[in-house]
Amino acid sequence: MTGLLRNPVKNYDWGSHTAIATLTGRPSPAERPEAEMWFGTHPSGSSSVLRDGTWRSLADTVAADPVGELGAETVERFGSRLPYLLKLIAVDLPLSLQVHPSREQAEEGFARGTYVDPFPKPELICALTPFTALAGFRPAGEAAELIGGLGLPALEPFVAPLAAGDVSAALRALVQWPKEGRAELLDAIARAAAADGGPDHELVVRLAGIHPEDPACLAPLFLRRHDLRPGEAIFLGAGVLHCYLSGFGVEIMGGSDNVLRAGLTGKPMDVEELLRVTDPSVPPLRIEPEGGLYRTPAPEFRLGTAVPGAGLTLRGGVPRILLCTAGEVEGGGHALRPGESAFVPASYGPVELRGSGTLFWAEPGTD
């Protein structure tokens, strides 16, 4: 049986007072910043599903009948857990600079107590509004030229390894930068970047205003910038250093909390594990939808989107979350309006969609 969902909102400081509230038809601006709305079974915030007039945790519902809710194939591949987490994400302030481990790294790290779970955390972000992110390294020589162009000899411990093509050594120098003199250095970086005036340098100035003692504010000069238009998406696999800067979008990821931070945060950093996991050679991937599906290398998830019109049929046999972001869409026995969602269990069979609105759906990927 399908069921409407009620979903938790996460009030992180970097979130928006308006984006999620407006989409879901609640009073806007919200009193507190709303960063994310979660759709799924995550232990830190499971959705609730309406069945037979009663709201029940979706996580408990899945645990009570894994094969019926997830399907035998999904259980065989991922165990008795929904392998993905779907989100609305609203970014008003930059997130931390971060990276996630591969499946093998997560399993090994969990066994030795480094990670909180044994799962990878690949991510796909699809823009609903213009969305800006930093992801993947620029060529080392290009980064050395940009940062060296600031004309600050104090940055030589970072610039020199970049110029030599040793990105890992440069990253180590950055995250282990001496505490003494950081405020003065960041002030000099901000002034030099402001004098240049280019868009990436303007981002450096913005980050330095938020994190006035963090040399990771140089990230716009050593990472690639991605400006996504609505409907455009980027996939971030294991080892890809990244940071969301601004915008509103639909995000889907592997169900994991494994995060390694490299800066732009006051949270602790595991430097050695960060350097072991970060892979400068792995680029982010721009993903174009094929037949409405954003196909990625991640087996945990696949994101779909469509304006169904007179009719669209999705195959059955997989656990699927439906999310309307505009207009009205009928699917799984429900008429969904913006911000409304439903869970369709694997046992339901094919899902008939119709309507002039915009629908996103989440389902497991393929191996």
Identify the function of each model-found stretch.
Residues 1-196, 266-284, 303:
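Transition-metal
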Residues 197-255:
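Acidic, glycine-rich loop-and-beta core segments that form the ion-binding/anion-interacting portion
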Residues 223-236, 240-243, 306, 331-350:
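Short acidic-glycine-tyrosine-enriched beta hairpin
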